[in-house]
């Protein structure tokens, strides 16, 4: 499913607000639709490694004193909407996925494309790196996940079991398990070694938009268009907590904070919420961006200042002060909705990706 049509068929309502954290897609579908990046392709195309040069460019960004991010490069290479951008845990690579059915791996030293992972029959909605940066798992509209060995560009396993678009995925910190969420409304847990599904959680009553492990892998959080954020015990598959406000707009994204104590959720009512999930309460709410159509990634940035980062449907990337909730910067340069973003694990750097016809990845850096 192409991110450019990843939107619900209901109009989400507005939500409420209130302390400390550390730190897409397009197809004709029955479901309301966060999802994927479909387009028809030959069955099982070969996996290829395609080196590509990229041309850095510059652009404008509007700055409110605080974060100091500036555009340093624009990367081109994908032919359709960007669905996800993620730095490798080692910080040496940037992965990007797209409706064009591929994942590309860019070397951060010169922004050259080192590898292109192919094999999916339809668009790739999401992907995740293993902890050692040597494997990638992908989630696709073709209802499968695939695990690739990055150094050899080898497709190691295909994970089958979901009955609708696979929209989101993540490795646990030990890289022994993969969690996935789907338009079939389920969350599945997979054994990486065998490629078998070890648990199927009847998680939600609408498509699952995001899944994430906590820092030790003992818990999973999932978000859905049913408006719920749920926390699951990884070992037994039991739901240990459901987070919901008085208003429950569709949940577009969820992620544990780096210290594992909080959950950041993105909601289709133009808000981000920081939850103390132990107490089941919203601590903070971040506003100012536009998000009522697409599943947009949000991030904690803890390498410099403590920021919350998110793309926006107004073609910008927004940076909030985590504690004060103020917008400290908005980054301009993309020409379409920015649904993908990530923060570098060691440097004050952001990667962002936009819908078609923009199709670009942009790299932003702060020297503050």
UniProtKB/Swiss-Prot annotation:
Region (Disordered): 1-64
Protein name: WD repeat-containing protein wdr-5.1
Biased composition regions of type Low complexity, renumbered to the chain: 16-42
InterPro entries xrefs: G-protein_beta_WD-40_rep, WD40/YVTN_repeat-like_dom_sf, WD40_repeat_CS, WD40_repeat_dom_sf, WD40_rpt
Parts forming coiled coils: none
The organism's place on the tree of life at top rank: Eukaryota
GO molecular function, one term: RNA polymerase II-specific DNA-binding transcription factor binding
PROSITE patterns documented for this protein: WD_REPEATS_1, WD_REPEATS_2, WD_REPEATS_REGION
Gene3D superfamilies (UniProt xref): YVTN repeat-like/Quinoprotein amine dehydrogenase
WD repeats (start-end): 77-116, 119-158, 161-200, 203-242, 246-285, 288-330, 333-368
Keywords: Repeat, WD repeat
Disulfide bonds: none
Gene Ontology annotations of biological process type: determination of adult lifespan; programmed cell death; transdifferentiation
A GO CC annotation given for this chain: Set1C/COMPASS complex
